[in-house]
Amino acid sequence: MFTLIVILAVSYLIGSIPTSIIAGRLLKGIDIRDFGSGNAGGTNAFRVLGWKAGLTVTILDIVKGAIAAISVVVFFESHPIGPLPDINPIALRLIAGLSAVFGHVFTVFAGFKGGKGVSTAAGMMFGIAPVTTLIVLGVFLLVVFLSRYVSVASILAAIAFPVIIAVRKYLFDLGEGLDYYIRMFNTNVFIHDSLDYHLLIFGFIVAAAIMYTHRANIRRLLSGKENRVKFHGHS
């Protein structure tokens, strides 16, 4: 139990690193939460600080989730400070990753007012199920391109993750669909993911959490006041 608590604490602290707030302080001497949408995330960094800073913040937030889901757990597996918890390995990585997402949303370093957790959740999922996450990324980019609403893309991508896991696990694994034909050609790139039922359950939990953190965006969408992204950007 002690090791699990330490893993959760370290993952939370990693997730709590307020990348967009740090970027705002360093680049413009501002608290990014006082501008744009008021959110301490990558999307608002794009709006307030420009595309270069926004992209950097987004990448770093993704890395936070991946580190928590992979590196933190692997470190304590190879450098034990006590017995590891008797938990399914995928579930343990998901719990660590979710702790990082929680840290991003409720960062201890900035008054527990952080971002929405989309990028950090994406990093967690990429570390565990890279192929599925890349498919979800395609969904995200397509929706952004067509609608120019990052919030809509984030919500739909979050919902798409568990749906894709379910389709691949319970449909393609029956010997039908793309997975079957890829196996016929002795290529396993499409089936590297850990299609574990824990992943499916946590996928739905994360989707619900993402929808909850986007509740203000949903209200603005319904009232026609949600901001659209501009592709030309600025530095």
From Swiss-Prot:
Localization in the cell: Cell inner membrane
Pathway membership: Lipid metabolism; phospholipid metabolism
Root EC class: transferase
EC number: 2.3.1.275
Molecular-function GO terms, alphabetical: acyl-phosphate glycerol-3-phosphate acyltransferase activity
GO CC terms, sorted: plasma membrane
GO biological process, one term: phospholipid biosynthetic process
InterPro entries: G3P_acylTferase_PlsY (IPR003811)
Keywords: Cell inner membrane, Cell membrane, Lipid biosynthesis, Lipid metabolism, Membrane, Phospholipid biosynthesis, Phospholipid metabolism, Transferase, Transmembrane, Transmembrane helix
Catalytic activity reported: an acyl phosphate + sn-glycerol 3-phosphate = a 1-acyl-sn-glycero-3-phosphate + phosphate
Organism superkingdom: Bacteria
One Pfam family linked to the record: G3P_acyltransf
Residues spanning the membrane: 2-22, 56-76, 94-114, 126-146, 152-172, 190-210
Bilayer topology: Multi-pass membrane protein
NCBIfam families to which the protein is assigned, alphabetical: glycerol-3-phosphate 1-O-acyltransferase PlsY
Recorded family membership: Belongs to the PlsY family.
PANTHER family xref list: GLYCEROL-3-PHOSPHATE ACYLTRANSFERASE-RELATED, INNER MEMBRANE PROTEIN YGIH
Function as written in the Swiss-Prot or TrEMBL entry: Catalyzes the transfer of an acyl group from acyl-phosphate (acyl-PO(4)) to glycerol-3-phosphate (G3P) to form lysophosphatidic acid (LPA). This enzyme utilizes acyl-phosphate as fatty acyl donor, but not acyl-CoA or acyl-ACP.
Subunit architecture: Probably interacts with PlsX.
Protein name: Glycerol-3-phosphate acyltransferase
Organism for this UniProt entry: Chlorobium phaeobacteroides (strain BS1)
Gene responsible for this protein: plsY
